[in-house]
């Protein structure tokens, strides 16, 4: 390259001294000739040498207006992978514009076809069937009983009033009741609604996970204290003056801080932020209010009509229409899911963390870059992932289980809670959620085996976009048949 560049520069100087046979050259040719003449020495062996000023011969060449004899060089097209070009910002903007226009058309089509269906007052009926009966809020308040019971057991274990075996038995009974009691109320009390049931069961599920962690951490502290006592050591309190040590953590203040903190894993000393940022908190609260209204509006205006129109194809088993309705439902469902993710994991959890000065704000990672199903499940819900690793996966490994069996165990637990939170509020057990979660195991193997890089990322997005509407249609269809067609047939 250096020899060729130098030769080109020499040839231009030689031709520049000849009289022109073509008359005056255009300004573009003259500018190209000056640029190449100046760039010639930079392409030599001393590539870092500064470009010299144009020589007198080059100036003469510009004045005489010679055409450049060479205008091509070795290079790849921009879309070729070898070109090294990666600035596709304009194409990304084009995709965003096309997405906005496409959804605007769908929005106008929906308004023309159905009119305005958004009714904020109707949302109240989703939580309360009878204005004089509030079973869901009562269940949430009753959850305090289980938290106090776990606290009292730990207090007695700390002073030796209970043996570890008796404490374990009481904790198991308490944790089992946390899951069974609200489920029994939901199945037996007619005045509770599916949405109210879902919220109550979610509160009890979160309480179950938190108290499970609370019990484990206090047990580890007792074992560490007993080990230190048997070795003749005494815990040093001067090392960290502002930290809490066991059993000083066993207070109601500490317990309820943990219960309201945006985490499922208990610690004696949580990282704390120095102050409450009022502007940050205000932005998060405004986001919570805005996205709540947006989700309700999209569900009422977009999803509900699509689901209602999907019942007849399911009843007639018209597979082509079922696929068409599935794809039509995929867009609003996925959009609402993305909004829900931002609303919950960024707006809500950050607002709670800011109020409580909770320092660990890693509620999610870059799951949108997932190139495998496993990476997605490890990064989209960090509080649950940390709990599974700390209190389920690693304990199974310590007990001698293989990594493969531990992973299956984690997915089994996740599948159980997914089915618990769907089937019990709907009062029907179809195991679609359980099957969908367990199907993630072979799906993770398949995607990891046959798809890599961008293809793996596309496969993950495809499962998210298509998989969820399938489960939604399955449950809605069965719920519709069970609650609307069956009573009519019986009548």
Swiss-Prot record:
Position of sequence motif FYXDWWN motif: 363-369
Binding site for an acyl-CoA: 377-385, 393, 407, 480
Region (Disordered): 1-60
Spans within the Lumenal topological domain: 122-133, 188-194, 312-318, 424-431, 485-491
Region (MBOAT fold): 134-491
Cytoplasmic side: 1-86, 160-164, 227-276, 357-402, 451-452
Region of interest: Amphipathic helix (AH): 383-397
InterPro entries on file: Diacylglycerol_acylTrfase1 (IPR027251), MBOAT_fam (IPR004299), Oat_ACAT_DAG_ARE (IPR014371)
Listed Low complexity bias regions: 37-50
EC assignment: 2.3.1.20, 2.3.1.76
Modified residues (Phosphoserine): 20-21
Pathway(s) the chain acts in: Lipid metabolism; glycerolipid metabolism
Topology within the bilayer: Multi-pass membrane protein
Active site (UniProt): 418
Catalytic activity: an acyl-CoA + a 1,2-diacyl-sn-glycerol = a triacyl-sn-glycerol + CoA; all-trans-retinol + an acyl-CoA = an all-trans-retinyl ester + CoA; 2-(9Z-octadecenoyl)-glycerol + (9Z)-octadecenoyl-CoA = 1,2-di-(9Z-octadecenoyl)-sn-glycerol + CoA; 1,2-di-(9Z-octadecenoyl)-sn-glycerol + (9Z)-octadecenoyl-CoA = 1,2,3-tri-(9Z-octadecenoyl)-glycerol + CoA
Ranges in a coiled coil: none
Bilayer-crossing regions: 87-121, 134-159, 165-187, 195-226, 277-311, 319-356, 403-423, 432-450, 453-484
Domain of life of the source: Eukaryota
Region (Extracellular loop 1 (EL1)): 122-133
Subcellular location per the Swiss-Prot or TrEMBL entry: Endoplasmic reticulum membrane
Biological process annotations from GO: diacylglycerol metabolic process; monoacylglycerol biosynthetic process; triglyceride biosynthetic process
Record has Transmembrane helix as a keyword: yes
Record-stated family: Belongs to the membrane-bound acyltransferase family. Sterol o-acyltransferase subfamily.
Function as written in the Swiss-Prot or TrEMBL entry: Catalyzes the terminal and only committed step in triacylglycerol synthesis by using diacylglycerol and fatty acyl CoA as substrates. Highly expressed in epithelial cells of the small intestine and its activity is essential for the absorption of dietary fats. In liver, plays a role in esterifying exogenous fatty acids to glycerol, and is required to synthesize fat for storage. Also present in female mammary glands, where it produces fat in the milk. May be involved in VLDL (very low density lipoprotein) assembly. In contrast to DGAT2 it is not essential for survival.
Domain remark from Swiss-Prot or TrEMBL: The disordered N-terminal region is required for the diacylglycerol O-acyltransferase activity and may regulate enzymatic function via its interaction with the MBOAT fold.
Name this protein carries in UniProt: Diacylglycerol O-acyltransferase 1
Species this chain originates from: Chlorocebus aethiops (Green monkey)
